[in-house]
Amino acid sequence: MHKYKYSFFTLHFSLFTLLTGLLASCIDYDDASRLVNVKVQLNAPAEYLPGTPVGEQVITITKTGTKTGTGTSTGTGTSTGTGTMTGTTDASGIAVFEGCMPDVYDISTSWELTGAEYLAATGKPGSANGYMVTASISEQPVTEAQEQTPIMLQAVIAPKPALIISKIYCAGSRDANNKTYIPGKYIELFNQSDEPMDISGLYIGLLESSSPQVYSLAQLNEVYNGEKVVVKQVFQIPADEPFLLPARSTVLLVNSATDHSDVSEHEYDLRGADFEAKSTDSRHENNEAVKALTLAFSTFSAPLTYMNLMQGGPCGIIIFNTDEDITTWEKTYGYGKTTGTLSYLLVPKSIIRDGVDFLKKNNTSGGADISTKRLYQDIDAGYINISSASGYTGEVVYRRTAGTTADGGKILMDTNNSSNDFKVSTTIKPREYDEE
């Protein structure tokens, strides 16, 4: 048994990724006369030794614009028939996709490294828990004009966290009389390692959820060099005594550790929760038998001392550790503001152990608004959302099951990309995960 120690590589956010999103809104695709070929150049992480190849990696491109067409894929690209194509990089790190409709695309890839592979690639000792390498670009314009110019896809590398955010239930539900219900919300964290882990003192940060958002990623990069994340609340697992989380198991954090199962089929008995965010709010009944989460910081005043998990999102979450007094950290009223009624906390990106970017559905586009991402690529290269912008659907977002250990323990999907790692369900129960 050991107290988990963690360090995170501080990686620079790509200005190129930001600029491509801006360009996408300025290009007219209606004059495109033919299908085009797309060449993607995958560049190795900065930590790799000079000349170390990325190897054969699968790159995925997904058309996110509205342009229609019947393009086919040949060469190294393979079409899935769903607006998504996959291609494998060659010895130079290049993947070619032929017959693409000029439009806007998301491009991504990810792969794992063992500690030994990390040592071989970087020349530095690696963590036994392994590493994730990810690369992504959102809203990349593809036009005839840039057909001959490779799209640069920069990879970043980070340790695989042993403790991960595994489930978020923020949607709420409706009872038999169609009345909305919110007290049954909860968060789960999962010990992905093979050893018990002392998680006492762990901080759980809820990302700011304002509209418009307090800082866009571009603004955070401009003002804080991409080294801060903005949160509205921070809760802490009490640090006064050890809390050992067994290997391959879940810690359940709730707003009301009571039995909610009589409200609807989407609510559950949460009396077995590990920790509860105590509140004087009349809608949230406290359970004195369940330990209290410590409210370490809040943008809001009482009685909003429960976890402010927004029904339809955004509802992003980070977890981190620090020995510092977080109340002394820099706070902000928002981009360009020096005064205001709501003050938010700035968390150093370098200490974040895991993060999930949970976005709100855009009713106009039918998907999430990627421009509202709160987390950098090296924390979460993707995002997750539920089907309703207003919530009350009973939907839970949860990590896919990647496999099992020799003794039957769960291995949850963790590629640092929530678009890959998470699914949405209305039936999955607390502390349970799918088999895949």
Residue map of PLM features:
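Bacterial Sec-dependent N-terminal signal peptides
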Residues: M1-Y4, F16-L49, L153
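Glycine-centered loop-to-beta-strand initiation motif
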Residues: V40, T89-F97, E241, S249
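A structural motif detector for short, solvent-exposed N-terminal "entry" segments of globular domains
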Residues: P45-Y48, T52, A155-Q213, S301-G316, ...
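Short, ordered, surface-exposed loop/turn motifs in non-cytosolic proteins
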Residues: A46-T72, D198-G201
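Short, acidic Ser/Thr/Gly-rich low-complexity loop/linker segments typical of extracellular
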Residues: T66-A95
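Structured interaction patches on ligand/partner-binding surfaces of diverse proteins
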Residues: T84, L113-Q154
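A short, solvent-exposed beta-strand micro-motif common in secreted/extracellular proteins
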Residues: A95, G99-T122
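Solvent-exposed beta-edge/loop recognition patches
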Residues: G226-T427, E435
